[in-house]
């Protein structure tokens, strides 16, 4: 039981960035579905937890950059979500298991992405499909639709494999039985009911996934362009793998200024209409208002005659700071602010600090970020901009909030410099691709050491920087005002459908159980005895 479950999780992990073998998600999901057949509740729970470990040990490996013991605890807790989902799947018959399994896994992921401490979308299986043919589904149902499609596709693969294997076994039995004598009333053994159930399950699941992908491809994508914006995302460059406390804030700011000055020189003094700087490249020991940095950034916006959006952290008290995106207009006026809503637990704040300080060294997080409450909309001369700071790009609700408030273009100032590997930067780019598609908006992302990127509303990556390099990524992006199905309805349709599917699966299982008891049978559709 253990090996198939762990292998399923590892295959799902390999579908995620930075590895990006998106196609592995389907046989891996199918392997877990197959393994749950006939298992007792405790064994299903154990199988799901092992699969979760196989997924999150590599998928969330970057968390060891904070603390290895803490990372192991986090991964063990995250693995409980697929464990509980597997517990919620009836072990038989095939139809009940096929109906409930994708739905239960999707509901578990919906909870994982929002709880505890605001959830953790990073590491979700939906990110692996940013590079696959199912990305268009995000227009219909966001990350949960992609998640549901992965698990449903897994059922299709496993059921098809089971049906083929059953057919091969049937042929072997037929050949071994030798010739028959119809005159003597002999008959060739027929296909088992389980084989037929598997074939039907595979067909239905495949049709569901393919039809969803086709519908997503032709669904509203944000509408035609209502205007273009020349944009530049500035990446100052520098070393990676160092915590904020190990880096001189002045050197980070100096690299950003140098990259921006070089851009202006190469452009002959003409700057694009919108310039985006990354998260936290202006780090202040006090408030921004009235500081030298505010004056310098105001002067820079005037000199470039551009809308300048900058990631700023300002200390507001002895225990708190704000993580903001701040916009200056072409005349140097500060025109908008957005405070980050989804804070990184144990990275930007410590929940229950008085408790955890007895268990771990919290010196790396001396202050707690003040949570923002805004929609993310910034009204600027470059147009209405929707801002998500850092890993908020993985939260579908942040982009949706901004678009519903009127945003015509999405911006993501982020900072992944603390991570030495490409895992977090690549997962953020994948999240940006999903975000752009589900909201129907072009998206510009800036990071001080990468990845800086530009993504279209159809999910096409127009440009991506080199990690660690000093670089300016430029593009002409479109502003749009149309809405996607996801912007209109959010996660509700997928959540309702998934909940109904789990209930229907258990109803089928109970009905089949009563029939077995009445007929004195032993199982349907390959369910077999409960182990």
Feature-to-residue mapping (PLM):
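Membrane-embedded alpha-helical bundles of multi-pass enzymes
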Residues: 1-173, 180-181, 186, 191-215, ...
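Compositionally biased, intrinsically disordered/low-complexity regions enriched for serine, proline
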Residues: 15, 99, 176-179, 186, ...
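Short amphipathic alpha-helical "recognition" segments used for binding
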Residues: 113, 175, 190-191, 283, ...
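Short, highly charged, low-complexity non-transmembrane loops/tails of multi-pass membrane proteins
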Residues: 167-175, 181, 227, 521-529
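Compositionally biased, low-complexity segments enriched in small residues
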Residues: 176, 188, 518-520
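Soluble catalytic domains of enzymes that build or remodel membrane lipids, polysaccharides, and related
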Residues: 218-493
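Juxtamembrane interface at the cytosolic side of transmembrane helices
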Residues: 503-531
């Amino acid at each position: 039981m253990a090996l198939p479950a762990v292998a399923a999780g590892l295959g799902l992990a390999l579908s995620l960035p930075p590895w990006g073998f998106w196609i592995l998600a389907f046989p891996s999901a199918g392997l877990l579905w197959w393994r749950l057949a006939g298992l007792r509740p405790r064994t299903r729970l154990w199988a799901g937890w092992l699969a979760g470990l196989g997924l999150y040990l590599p998928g969330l490996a970057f968390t060891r950059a904070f603390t290895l013991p803490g990372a192991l605890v986090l991964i063990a807790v995250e693995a409980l979500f697929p464990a509980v989902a597997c517990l919620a799947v009836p072990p038989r018959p095939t139809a009940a298991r096929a109906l409930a399994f994708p739905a239960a896994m999707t509901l578990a992921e919906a909870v994982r992405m929002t709880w505890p401490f605001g959830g953790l979308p990073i590491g979700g299986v939906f990110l692996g499909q940013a590079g696959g043919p199912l990305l268009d589904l995000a227009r219909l149902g966001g990350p949960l639709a992609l998640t549901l499609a992965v698990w449903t596709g897994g059922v299709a693969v496993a059921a098809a494999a089971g049906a083929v294997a059953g057919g091969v076994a049937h042929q072997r039995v037929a050949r071994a039985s030798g010739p028959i004598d119809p005159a003597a009333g002999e008959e060739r053994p027929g296909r088992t009911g389980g084989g037929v159930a598997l074939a039907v399950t595979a067909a239905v699941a495949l049709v569901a996934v393919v039809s969803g992908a086709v519908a997503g491809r032709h669904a509203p994508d944000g509408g035609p362009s209502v205007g273009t914006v020349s944009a530049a995302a500035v990446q100052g460059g520098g070393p990676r793998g160092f915590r904020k406390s190990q880096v001189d804030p002045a050197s980070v700011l100096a690299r950003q200024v140098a990259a921006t000055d070089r851009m202006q020189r190469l452009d002959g003094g003409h700057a694009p209409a919108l310039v985006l700087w990354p998260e936290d490249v202006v780090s202040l020991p006090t408030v921004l208002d009235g500081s030298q940095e505010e004056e310098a950034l105001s002067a820079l916006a005037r000199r470039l005659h551009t809308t300048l959006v900058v990631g700023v952290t300002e200390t507001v008290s002895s225990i708190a700071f704000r993580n903001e995106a701040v916009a200056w207009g072409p005349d140097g006026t500060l025109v908008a602010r957005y405070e980050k809503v989804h804070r990184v637990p144990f990275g930007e704040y410590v929940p229950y600090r008085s408790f955890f300080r007895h268990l771990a060294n919290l010196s790396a997080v001396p202050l707690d970020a003040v949570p923002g409450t805004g929609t993310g909309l910034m009204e600027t001369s470059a147009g209405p901009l929707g801002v998500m700071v850092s890993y908020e790009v993985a939260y579908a609700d942040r982009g949706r909030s901004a678009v519903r408030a009127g945003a015509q273009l999405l911006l993501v100032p982020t900072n992944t410099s603390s991570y030495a590997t490409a895992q977090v930067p690549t997962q953020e780019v994948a999240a940006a691709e999903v975000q752009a598609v589900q909201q129907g908006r072009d998206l510009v992302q800036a990071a001080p050491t990468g990845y800086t990127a530009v993504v279209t509303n159809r999910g096409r990556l127009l440009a991506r920087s080199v990690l660690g390099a000093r670089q300016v990524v430029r593009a002409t992006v479109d502003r749009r005002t149309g809405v996607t199905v996801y912007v209109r309805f959010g996660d509700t349709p997928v959540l309702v459908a998934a909940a109904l599917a789990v209930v229907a699966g258990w109803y089928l299982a109970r009905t089949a159980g009563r029939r077995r008891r009445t007929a004195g049978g032993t199982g349907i559709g390959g369910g077999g005895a409960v182990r």
